[in-house]
Each structure stands twice: as structure tokens, then as C-alpha cells.
């Protein structure tokens, strides 16, 4: 059984409820040299868009860093908790110092603050959003990621209690409910890996949904169409036409007709029509089916 951590969870919820991500009005802002800061171990960002980083650097060069970085002291160094993108852009802009607010934060609190800032990005893709919110849920409930995922689905059916209130508080700050997240977005993590990678690269969720719900043998074809600019209606239309990517072989028919999943999904009239066709099918197809059996 997973051991819960109620005291640490209260500390985390206090951070979420009382420490704003917008630190521009803090009364203890100070300046630190950029070379005295290091990337935080709790940062959720995987990469930075160089073009957007350059644009931010130009803005900083003209107006300065308007939003202080949130940092903490770790082993005699200052570690960035929130604001790594501004720190990198400030270096590109040639700044020697950046404004910071220093807080004493645990690893768990620092991770939560970094996640919250990351989730407020304008260009956040849906996979980073789902990953970040699931990790925030795990921190809130004091569970590992996969355990939190299972627990979230259990809470949808459970009588409201302490955990419901904690999740309500966390998601309220993000303008969403955890129930909506659990019902509509959490399932995305079950989609095929190529679709997840495409979503992370910017593919719209509406297109990814069509690809993920298509038969496995059509997904690569549809994903390529989506990445080349096809609309949702065009993907749905393509799904209604036979695949043009490869010739249909007797072996392919045999594989489909030998699939229990395929056969169990047929209604009675379709199954009867298939039986009639099988009674007069070509010998080459019959041999292929026998080989698949």
C-alpha cells in the first residue's frame, strides 16, 4: 500500500494557494548575476523554441525582464524554480543581471511551482499539458504518477472527500475542473506513440483524435496526411476510402478474416454475407487463411 504524506501535501497546497506565479508585485525582488543561476532540477521543460526565445530576447533587450524569476538556494547556489526561459533569453540579450525572488522551497514545492508556470504558457501543447497536470495531481495526492492516474479515475466514482477538495483547489487556479480533465484528456496518454509525438510537435488535438481512433493499419497514412495539412473532414473522408499506400494481398485478407476482434464486431447480416462470400472465395485466399489459422 502506498504511504500518504498529508503534511507535505498541506505544504504543497499552501504554496499553490498563497504563492502567486506572478511575482512582479513581490516586495523582496533582488538582482542576481545570470552566471550565478543554474537550471533547476525540477524544471519540466524539455526544449525551447529558438525562434520564440530570440523574440523574447529582443523584448528583454528593449524593456528588460518584467517578471522576476523564482529561485531557491541549493547547496550554496541559486537554482531556478520558475523562469528558465526568461533567464536564457536574458543571456541572449546580453544582460548581466536578472530580477529574482528567493524562496525556501522543498523539492516537491519547487516542482509544483515550475509545473504551474509551465502550464500557463500560451504555446503549451496538449501532451505537455496532460503530463504536467497529471504530475501536479500526483504531487497533490502524494502518489507516484501511475498510481495518481488510477486514483483519479477512482475519485470520479467516489463520494466527495478530502482528496476531491484538494484537487478542486489545484485546478481552480488553472480555470478547469479535475473531473473534466480526467474524463476528456487523460485518455490521450493511451494513444499510439507516433500520435503523441506528433501532438507534442504541434499537431492539433482534433486531428490527433481522428488518427488515434482509426484502425491501426491506417494510422500512419492518416498521420502523414494530417502533418501535411489535411483538415479533420479530409481525414475522415480519407478514412472512408481504401488505403492507397499498399496493394491489398490475399495475406492481408487472411489476417483480417482470422481476427477474432474483427469477427466479433460484425452484426448478423454482415456476418451472414461474409459466410456466403467465404463459401465461394478464391483458392489463394483460402490457403492464406489456413496458413494464418
From Swiss-Prot:
**One GO term describing the cellular component:** chromosome
- GO annotation, biological process: chromosome segregation
> Which Cys pairs does UniProt list as disulfide-bonded?
none
Give the UniProt keywords, A-Z.
Chromosome partition, DNA-binding
Q: Which Pfam families match?
A: ParBc (PF02195)
Q: Name one GO molecular function term.
A: DNA binding
State the family named in the UniProt similarity comment for this chain.
Answer: Belongs to the ParB family.
| Record-linked NCBIfam families | parB_part
Function, as annotated: Involved in chromosome partition. Localize to both poles of the predivisional cell following completion of DNA replication. Binds to the DNA origin of replication.
- Name-wise, this protein is Probable chromosome 2-partitioning protein ParB
Gene encoding this polypeptide? parB2
Amino acid at each position: 500500500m502506498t504511504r500518504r504524506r498529508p503534511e507535505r501535501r498541506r505544504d504543497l497546497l499552501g504554496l499553490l494557494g498563497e504563492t502567486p506565479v506572478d511575482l512582479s508585485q513581490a516586495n523582496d525582488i533582488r538582482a542576481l548575476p545570470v552566471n550565478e543561476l543554474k537550471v533547476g532540477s525540477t524544471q519540466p521543460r524539455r526544449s525551447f523554441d529558438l525562434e520564440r526565445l530570440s523574440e523574447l530576447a529582443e523584448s528583454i533587450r528593449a524593456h528588460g525582464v518584467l517578471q522576476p524569476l523564482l529561485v531557491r538556494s541549493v547547496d550554496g547556489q541559486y537554482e531556478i524554480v520558475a523562469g528558465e526561459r526568461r533567464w536564457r533569453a536574458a543571456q541572449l540579450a546580453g544582460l548581466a543581471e536578472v530580477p529574482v525572488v528567493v524562496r525556501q522551497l522543498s523539492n516537491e514545492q519547487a516542482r509544483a511551482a515550475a509545473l504551474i508556470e509551465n502550464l500557463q504558457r500560451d504555446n503549451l501543447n496538449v501532451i505537455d499539458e496532460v503530463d504536467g497536470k497529471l504530475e501536479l495531481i500526483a504531487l497533490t495526492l502524494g502518489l507516484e504518477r501511475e498510481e495518481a492516474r488510477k486514483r483519479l479515475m477512482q475519485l470520479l466514482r467516489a463520494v466527495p472527500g478530502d482528496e476531491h477538495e484538494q484537487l478542486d483547489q489545484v485546478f481552480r487556479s488553472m480555470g478547469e475542473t479535475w473531473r473534466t480533465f480526467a474524463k476528456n484528456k487523460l485518455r490521450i496518454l493511451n494513444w499510439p506513440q507516433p500520435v503523441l509525438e506528433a501532438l507534442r510537435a504541434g499537431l492539433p488535438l482534433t486531428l490527433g483524435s481522428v488518427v488515434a481512433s482509426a484502425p491501426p493499419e491506417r494510422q500512419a497514412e492518416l498521420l502523414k496526411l494530417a502533418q501535411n495539412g489535411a483538415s479533420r473532414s479530409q481525414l475522415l473522408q480519407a478514412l472512408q476510402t481504401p488505403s492507397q499506400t499498399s496493394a491489398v494481398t490475399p495475406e492481408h485478407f487472411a489476417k483480417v478474416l482470422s481476427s477474432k476482434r474483427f469477427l466479433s464486431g460484425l452484426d448478423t447480416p454482415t456476418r451472414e454475407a461474409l459466410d456466403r462470400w467465404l463459401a465461394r472465395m478464391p483458392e489463394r485466399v483460402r490457403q492464406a487463411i489456413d496458413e494464418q489459422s
